[in-house]
Curated annotation (Swiss-Prot):
Binds 1 lipoyl cofactor covalently. Belongs to the GcvH family. It comes from Alkalilimnicola ehrlichii (strain ATCC BAA-1101 / DSM 17681 / MLHE-1). It comes from the Bacteria. It holds the Pfam family GCV_H. This is Glycine cleavage system H protein. The glycine cleavage system catalyzes the degradation of glycine. The H protein shuttles the methylamine group of glycine from the P protein to the T protein. PROSITE patterns: BIOTINYL_LIPOYL (PS50968). The modification N6-lipoyllysine is found at residue 65. NCBIfam families: gcvH (TIGR00527), PRK01202.1 (NF002270). The gene is gcvH. Keywords: Lipoyl.
């Protein structure tokens, strides 16, 4: 069964977003996404300091099966990329909602989070895809 934490927001391309206390967003790929991809062998993290628009490709994850773009769920500037993933891409598989986070951004408008899926809607999306 796919883990879908109830304190996160989701988008249709299987990224999760967590609003931090300082107003920044931590972003990664969902448990469903990492499961579908299989064992990750490489993560290309986004460029710190670069601005990405909502739904713009900003990172890449590669597994033994496929490569997949990661999309910015909302517009904003990347303030941190998870450097641990350079040497340990498997963190995305083993802890997708924790140590396997991919980036942190400062959103242009935190109200944009309202456009993302809540956990129940994301679970419905995953169920429809299976």
């Amino acid at each position: 069964m796919t883990q879908v934490p109830d304190n996160l927001k989701y988008n249709r391309t299987h990224e999760w977003t967590r609003l931090e206390d300082d107003g920044t967003l931590t972003i990664g790929i969902t448990d469903h996404a990492q499961s579908e991809l299989g064992d990750l062998v490489f993560v290309e993290t986004p460029t710190v300091g670069r601005h990405y628009d909502a739904e713009e490709a900003c990172a890449v994850v590669e597994s033994v099966k496929a490569a997949s773009d990661i999309y910015a769920p909302v517009g904003g500037e990347v303030i941190e990329a998870n450097s641990e993933l350079q040497d340990s891409p498997e963190l995305v598989n083993t802890d997708p909602y924790g140590e396997g986070w991919i980036m942190r951004i400062r959103p242009d408008d935190s109200d944009d989070l309202e456009q993302l899926l809540d956990p129940e809607d994301y679970q419905d999306l995953v169920a429809d895809e299976e």
